[in-house]
């Protein structure tokens, strides 16, 4: 099928130029006559790849030199455990800001390793979900760290401002909005993100960790989750997912070649504005997130009728608009418009939404 647009929440759409490059090199990488999947992860060419990937990602995201970039396995869920094992070893407790499913899931996992205080910071006003607090400077320093998820993929709730935690360590699960816009990395102790939405394919998680937070893991921390061990081993204490790492490196190069984070931010804002502007004009579809907390990456909407929603998803799929079904815990529809989604994809979705409305209103 031609002109297919993939709105999946993850694994998500990859940049077409990256897929084409990977296809071209699949059987003969770096003139070696073998695939990148077959070469030694400690060989000359792959070591050059990871060095360049670190450099490119650091340039793209303006990551300070006093931060390490780790390319690990286990996804964000693995980091739900790794974070407390590496950080919660002084005061013995952590604060988790709850804005939805993934922040709550992270808090639940952390309770296996430390005391957790969980604070719900969303509320419903006039049927809309909004974040009601971002200043925690009065309580944050009693904790080893403060954790939050700035973009809840399921509901489409996003925190657009960095929470104020004073001098406490701020940790962010940015799996679904990393590299969506410019960010002051220095405000964070740790940022982690599964690659499968904005950075590459599934199979790798990127952890940006401030160097002074490395080296404090509890004794029982498995080496695979120990940031010091991984940093000292170039993220390779075991054989890494080399093909996923390679694809991430291609994504970084593609972003740099096409304007970097400035261009990404402008295009993402344009795509989100197009879709939300339409949702605000129609009475057929509804978005239930307050405007100031609407996600730029995950746009949720519903007709209010489950059968009509199912019909929408089925017909959209036939029209080449894939993976628009909402998460099972939230329902409705969800359009994930990550970095690789072109403006044309959003325009095609809006055109279909208008057609469906005209036929079913």
UniProtKB/Swiss-Prot annotation:
UniProt keyword terms in alphabetical order: Amino-acid biosynthesis, Aminotransferase, Cytoplasm, Pyridoxal phosphate, Pyridoxine biosynthesis, Serine biosynthesis, Transferase
InterPro entries, per database record: Aminotrans_V_dom (IPR000192), Pser_aminoTfrase (IPR022278), PyrdxlP-dep_Trfase (IPR015424), PyrdxlP-dep_Trfase_major (IPR015421), PyrdxlP-dep_Trfase_small (IPR015422)
Positions where N6-(pyridoxal phosphate)lysine occurs in the chain: 197
GO molecular function list: O-phospho-L-serine:2-oxoglutarate aminotransferase activity; pyridoxal phosphate binding
Entry binding sites for L-glutamate: 42
Cofactor remark: Binds 1 pyridoxal phosphate per subunit.
Family annotation (Pfam families): Aminotran_5
Reactions performed catalytically: O-phospho-L-serine + 2-oxoglutarate = 3-phosphooxypyruvate + L-glutamate; 4-(phosphooxy)-L-threonine + 2-oxoglutarate = (R)-3-hydroxy-2-oxo-4-phosphooxybutanoate + L-glutamate
Pathway: Amino-acid biosynthesis; L-serine biosynthesis; L-serine from 3-phospho-D-glycerate: step 2/3; Cofactor biosynthesis; pyridoxine 5'-phosphate biosynthesis; pyridoxine 5'-phosphate from D-erythrose 4-phosphate: step 3/5
Iron keyword on record: no
GO cellular component assignments: cytoplasm
Compartments where located: Cytoplasm
EC number(s) on file: 2.6.1.52
Entry-linked NCBIfam families: PRK05355.1, serC_1
Identification of the protein by name: Phosphoserine aminotransferase
Chain's gene name: serC
